[in-house]
Amino acid sequence: LIIMDLEGIFGLFGFSEENNKKKLKELEALKDTPRFKLGMFHKLVMNSLIFKKQTLKFFSKSSPKLDLDDIDTAGEFMVYTRAYYWIQDFKIRSKEWKLALKEYYSDEEFLCSLKLTINYFESTEEYEKCAFLKKIQDLVIKNINTNKNEI
């Protein structure tokens, strides 16, 4: 009778238990960084436009017919609420947050994400969120203008 050491076999492929735990800790630490949180905010907003089209197309073919306006409204709520979750920890006076914003997200595309999110929260009359996002938007605009002047 031969007894196989499965952990040893899978270890040959780089899947050791210790390695997995280390990677999980690294990923958890990454999720707490300003760069990651800003990136998740941006990705959710930008991908929401594609998601919206796909969702509406899918439900338009359903039987019985569903109210596409309600589906669109629910989808927007989910996207922008979740996107805000990722950016709500932004600290205006934090060097770490400002540096992540300046180095990775001070461009027109990120500015578009902020504007879309501000417009959504204006439509739902959540003005505190709008004011918070406007401060970040102002920093992005300042960084964009500074980068233009350096060129």
Label each PLM-derived region with a short phrase.
Residues 2-122, 138-151:
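Long, low-complexity, acidic Ser/Pro- and Gly-enriched intrinsically disordered regions
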